Amino acid sequence: RDSLGAMPTSGGTFTGTVRFQQPTYFGGDKTYYITADGTANFRKVYGAVYNDYAEWFPRGCDTKPGDIIALDVSSQTERYIKAVGKMDRVVGVHTDEYAYLIGGDTPDEKDDNFKANIEKYIPVSLAGRVRVRVTGRVKTGDLILPSGTPGIGRAACAGEFAPAECIVGYAVEGDDRTDERRIRVRVRG
């Protein structure tokens, strides 16, 4: 089998911690590592081709990718639902494009994180660009607000006041369509 030093170039199993060290300009080493429990420490990550940073939020209703999500202020427990109208406390968008997804419950070793959490939590985009469900004409740069249809957004009208808690983000693309579709929005964050 081919190897690079003590590490095989393919196959095999590592146990414990794999460390990468790099000498620093001022002496000493900068250490990066991956542990057997899944913890990783790196200075930079490249190649994440997806568009946003997301967190699992407690689910209060059925949602689908692109839905605008808000805190359910009628509940005494933390849960999140589809935003509607100028609803307070918009938190983000149900995403299926995340580069990073944090939170949720720790799955059993053999379980997939997504499958273990999707029934109980919503993957909500907190920062970055994500495709949002909208209706009506949208121009690049328009602020996106919840519409009167739960989970669906719309472009703010010229001169319309919207509290910061209601703003989803701004459109980074636009079109003249009026049907329901998904457009890319830079979520506030």
Give short role names for the model-derived ranges:
Residues R1-T35:
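Fibrous stalk/shaft segments of extracellular and virion attachment machinery
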